[in-house]
């Protein structure tokens, strides 16, 4: 009997080709288009209608049924409110990671099972390992890096539990992006030449600052140099991220050396933005970070008192960094991560993700680091 797969179809080329490949592999395939954001009437920002039309065109072309589901309420409750709270607390969140965990897998799987699915599938560039059991006897599948190193998306899926990975197929995770485009062109799919989506799904093509100030009041404050000297005003700390180059709005500073300016530190207590020159400025360097509420793909991870050796990324596409993980007993499911080499601009609110070779072990949100605090604070 054919196994039934519901493919999350976004209107992009990756999910389109995923559906086509699964058909070729003999599965009974249907699509599901998820609407996760209720755009304002009359706005031109959201491409949801165009994306739905593209997904429908592909479904019609390859001869499958396309379902639709509205997860906007779940998205608001589980993702967007957290996103706003993190910005309000002075951190820089990554909503795509929470969206994958809560919506594109958890809510999607729940909905797909009501449609009689054996599996779901997505267009992510990751792979699923062989199903196994953890020490509690729970079945899960390891999350593996995608074959295409340049497109590997395991960083964004690290918070998805292995029991959900166990129910998911990743057809394009086994091939490279140029090959995906070729398959789409060969099949004459409407999405073959469509650009990859960029930015956060609920913002669309809007300027980020304009979007954020609709929900959070901006609190302007002083811009200061790394010696404490005031040199200007910022629009609100939430608009800046550590290590950011440019976009600070200073122009040429009288008496300053030529060179780029970087965000070095956010002084939340005094609402000051600390900037300085030098890509490797000491105030941006850290060797240790702390995280809590770690999501382990296996549902668990044995970390001995002597520490656990692995590699980690603190941002997407960063080369793997050798590190040792220690348990942090002061925090719920917390860890302390010590890197072999100093790390630049590790940002609270972003995620640290752990790997052993091809296996993505899981990760968590960065709370803080041991980067030095400016002397004048």
Swiss-Prot record:
For this protein, the Enzyme Commission number is: 2.8.1.13
The positions flagged as active site in the entry are 99, 201
- Class of the enzyme per the UniProt entry, highest EC level: transferase
The ranges of region (Interaction with tRNA) come to 151-153, 315-316
Indicate yes or no for the key word Disulfide bond: yes
Q: Which InterPro entries match?
A: MnmA-like (IPR004506), MnmA-like_C (IPR046885), MnmA-like_central (IPR046884), MnmA-like_central_sf (IPR023382), Rossmann-like_a/b/a_fold (IPR014729)
Coiled-coil parts of chain: none
Q: Where in the cell is it found?
A: Cytoplasm
- Identify the stretch(es) annotated as Interaction with target base in tRNA: 94-96
Name the CDD domains for this protein. MnmA_TRMU-like (cd01998)
- One GO term of the cellular component aspect? cytoplasm
Question: Which cysteine pairs are covalently linked by disulfides here?
Answer: 99-201
Which Gene Ontology molecular-function terms are recorded? ATP binding; tRNA binding; tRNA-uridine 2-sulfurtransferase activity
Q: Which SUPFAM superfamilies match?
A: Adenine nucleotide alpha hydrolases-like
This protein's UniProt keywords:
ATP-binding, Cytoplasm, Disulfide bond, Nucleotide-binding, RNA-binding, Transferase, tRNA processing, tRNA-binding
Residues reported to bind ATP:
8-15, 34, 123
What is this protein for, i.e. what is its function?
Catalyzes the 2-thiolation of uridine at the wobble position (U34) of tRNA, leading to the formation of s(2)U34.
Entry protein name: tRNA-specific 2-thiouridylase MnmA
Q: Which organism is it from?
A: Acinetobacter baylyi (strain ATCC 33305 / BD413 / ADP1)
> Which taxonomic lineage does the organism of this UniProt entry have?
Bacteria, Pseudomonadati, Pseudomonadota, Gammaproteobacteria, Moraxellales
